[in-house]
Amino acid sequence: MIRLETRFASSFVNSRKFESFLTEAESSRRTLHSFQGKGNEYLGWLNLPKEIKESEIEKIIQVAQRLRDSSEVIVVIGIGGSYLGSRAVLEATLPFFRRSSKGNPEIFFAGHHLESRYLSELMEYLKDRDFSVNVISKSGTTTEPAIAFRLFWELLRKKYGASAASRVVATTDFSKGTLKTFANVEGFETFTIPDNVGGRYSVLTPVGLFPLAAAGIPIRKFILGSQNILKDLHAETDPVRNPATYYSAFRNYFLSEGRHIEILANFNPSLRYISEWWKQLFGESEGKENKGIFPASMDFTTDLHSLGQYVQEGKRILFETVLSPSDVHSNLILRPTPDNLDSLNFLSGNTLGHVNEQARLGTLLAHADGGVPCLELIFPDISPESLGEVMYFFEYSCAISGYSLGVNPFDQPGVDAYKKNMFALLNKVGFEKEGDFLRKRILGN
């Protein structure tokens, strides 16, 4: 079970004032379960772990294995919630260094930006390798993945001819949209994105599960982790004993005290993309109506040598939440040397994991002493099962926190602003007048 440790944060809290935030958080949790709050049409994720059908899990595993058996590389095309969840789990659980082969393919991502060098080099890399594609898009019209899929579909057809379609799996709408039509015409295997689950809450749908299965991750264990924590979070009505409600209360309390930035920190580089996924989850869910905590992330100890100075002595507008797995399976032991030229013999006999843990504790003490409240999210280890717990915990916490803030945690109206400008500047049909106006603005006219 996940635990929220507050030993380096509680001294920053006025207990009487905090009571009202606990009450509000539990009220928001009840609103969530009433299905009467803002955005309630997108609550399909709430009970999803216990509603996933075994037949769908089995189909995902079987289709993923077919691609694994025929591919040295699988390219996952998506952006935002259509890619960050699966990448977070893959980066956390797969070996840092591994050899790929048919049956154990490399996983690369595309369609999450518009930079041409990356796509060009990836396409060149694939020319002499067998590869397949999982394209993920509800509509099929999101610019970045749509462009990437056009390029990789052309490469597949050139390389495999009539059999190219067998190397594409499309995760999209059940019945409508550009990608669904494309899939029907070409005969792609498809999986469905539920209508009542938004992208950033979709890691437990085929959006997240298929790429995990394609990488060889045991998705049943990932689902099991989310199922286990769901039972606890849904049942516990005491906001102090429910870690998600407790976390939400702390977040909004610190915001009320002028701490507008939350840093999600880790001491394990494999967790970096958990932070990237978390930033989208909270940023899109809470950043609206001129409200919200800005979600940032840091990778320690690396960033202690760059941003650590600001955290220690900069403006006191921060609080930290530290991802803290209890077991990191460290087996590197530091041995003494006869000459001790590097002056490190004082560490002899210690595992590198022990050294990292002392760095973590020393950092928490220093930051708290410097005026930065630090929460610790304690979970068992960096395994698919534990990550299933962590990701459902954050989804549940985010919904509660958003309701406490008074916003709809399930929409993202602001993301269309840049798209409209981009379409106008690219002369998309229907945007011509806006394009002329924007070009004049850019030129200062």
Curated annotation (Swiss-Prot):
Organism phylogeny: Bacteria, Pseudomonadati, Spirochaetota, Spirochaetia, Leptospirales
Catalytic site positions: E284 (proton donor), H305, K419
Gene that this sequence comes from: pgi
Name of this chain's protein: Glucose-6-phosphate isomerase
EC assignment: 5.3.1.9
Catalytic activity as recorded in UniProt: alpha-D-glucose 6-phosphate = beta-D-fructose 6-phosphate
UniProt keyword annotations, A-Z: Cytoplasm, Gluconeogenesis, Glycolysis, Isomerase
GO cellular component: cytosol
Predominant place of localization: cytoplasm
Coiled coil: none
A GO MF label: carbohydrate derivative binding
Family: Belongs to the GPI family.
BP GO annotations: gluconeogenesis; glucose 6-phosphate metabolic process; glycolytic process
Localization terms from the record: Cytoplasm
One protein family per Pfam: PGI
Functional note: Catalyzes the reversible isomerization of glucose-6-phosphate to fructose-6-phosphate.
PANTHER family in alphabetical order: GLUCOSE-6-PHOSPHATE ISOMERASE (PTHR11469:SF1)
InterPro entries: G6P_Isomerase, Phosphoglucose_isomerase_CS, SIS_dom_sf, SIS_PGI_1, SIS_PGI_2
Record's keyword annotation contains DNA damage: no
Superkingdom as given in the UniProt entry: Bacteria
Listed pathway(s): Carbohydrate biosynthesis; gluconeogenesis; Carbohydrate degradation; glycolysis; D-glyceraldehyde 3-phosphate and glycerone phosphate from D-glucose: step 2/4
Enzyme class: isomerase
